[in-house]
Amino acid sequence: VGDKMKHYKLNQLFADEASSLEIPQFMLETGRSLFSEHVQQPLSKENLYAGFSLLDKDTVIDFDSVDSEIARIDIDDSDAMPKAWKLQGFDNQNVKKWFDEQPSDRKMRLCKDIIIKKLSNNNAVNDRDLDIYVDRIIQNLTEDQLTDMEQTPGIYALKINKKVNSLLNEYAKKMFYEWVEQDKISCLPSYKLPREISPTNTIASIPKSLYSEEENFDTEYERKVVMELSSLNNVRWWHRNIARKGFSINGAINAYPDLMVKTESGKLLLIETKGDQLENLESKEKAEMGAKWAEMAG
C-alpha cells in the first residue's frame, strides 16, 4: 500500500528552514544516563496512567439513558457485524437464542464475561481491578437495569468503557499537573516536520503551502481561514496538520492543531479552526493543554 501512496515533498522555497525547525513537545524526565544527569523522552498517555487503579474509583454511571444511547451510537461501518448484534454483544441470532434459554444466574455471569471481554484490551487497567469494578457496578443495578443488561450487554459494556476512560483521563490530568509542579515534565524542542507527507485527499491551489500539496480541508470555514491567512503579507507559509499522524500537543489529552502558520518574523502559530458550535468539554481541555504548552514552550 505504501508504494502506491503519493508523497508530497516540502516546497523547495521553505525546505531548509522547515527541516531545521524543532517544535517543542512535553518531555518526561526518566532519570540519568552515563552521559547526562537528565534523560528525557516524549511524554505519552501511558506514562500518565502509571499507578492508576479502579479499586478506589466511583461506579456512578447513567444507565437510564440506554435507549437514547442505542439510538445515537455509531458502530464502525467497516465491521460486517450488524449494528443490533454489536450493541447486544452477540455475534449472531443463534448465540442470542442460546443465551435467552439460559437460567438467570448464568445469564448474569455471561453478561459480565461479555463486558469484561470488551474492556480487557485496555492495557492501562489491571484485569483483576476491572473484574472487581464490574462486579461493583452490577451489584448496584436495579432489577430493571439488570433485565436491560441481559438484553443489551454490549451497550452496557460501551457505557462502562466510557466511564473507565473518563476516570483514566481525570487521573492523567491530575498526574500531568503534579509532574509539571515537580519539574518532571518540561517542554523542549523535539518534533521535526517530515520531508514528505502522504494525505489521501489533497489540495494544491492555495499559495504559501509548506508542502507541494496539503491535506484537503474538512470544512469550507477552514478553507476560508487558510485563504485569508495566505493573503497576509506577514505569513511565510502554512501547513495543514494531519490528525493522529502529524504534530500533537502531547499532554494529558492529545491535541492536534488544525494548522501551522509561520510568520515572516519567525513565529510559529498553531491554529484550531473548529467553530463555537463544536465546543465541548474535550475541546476546552485541549485549549487548556494548548495554553500550558505555549506557557512552557516560551
Protein language model regions, located:
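Catalytic cores and motor modules of nucleic-acid processing enzymes
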Residues: V1-Y256, V261-L269, L278, E282-E288, ...
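Catalytic core segments in nucleotide and nucleic-acid processing enzymes
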Residues: G275
